[in-house]
Amino acid sequence: MNLSHVERYFSDFLSHMETPDNPFEIDGYRNKDNEDESTGKLPYPENLFVIGTVNIDETTYMFSPKVLDRANVVEFKPDKDDVLNMFSSASQEIKITPAKSGVSEAFLRLAKEIRSGKSRVDEWQMAEVRNVFTAIYDITEKNGYEFAYRTVREIKQYISAAYELSGQWADAEIYRAIDEQLLQKVLPKIHGNRKEIGTMLDELEAVCKQNGKELELSRRKIEQMKGKLAAVQYASFI
């Protein structure tokens, strides 16, 4: 998605995605109800979920805060053993287990309900989510990386979905969801030199360690960013 500046081709799509009553206008498409119209309108479908791959090298462009605000950034890194096992000459049969009937319909129904604001997460559990992100907000705000309504709304939706999809919902699952959202929604926007983000990364790491290993994914990523900062005096999420 970032072989070109994303804003040049994706900004209109993001706007339509957030305003369902503002349909796409398609040039050259005739509306069947009015053959005189040269421009048709297409509403954003509720069952459309966008997943894009990102290339990270010197030939690509990083995403802007506008895009990052509306996305969950999921970083995939291959396991060392999986990489080196490619040298093996033995071929392995690939087995794909099909999803059970009704999974896609259930997922769509869950997405619609969560988008409408429904949540079965207990108040005390959501209060714990708020406490952790309040501490994170206080740290990021001092450095100009505070998050706003959209980010909070999407984090809450993620927590609600995690609750429904989890086989059990204890402290470990709550902090796992918090950890994933800190990693996917907050950290990707952080970048800068040692003076700009050095202290902030230290304070965010302290928040992760306050919860033991429950925010382990974010703690490891922060350590990686601090390593870059020490080596080249600049760090970013990727």
Please place each PLM-identified region on the residue numbering.
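C-terminal regulatory/interaction module of P-loop NTP-utilizing enzymes
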Residues: M1-I238
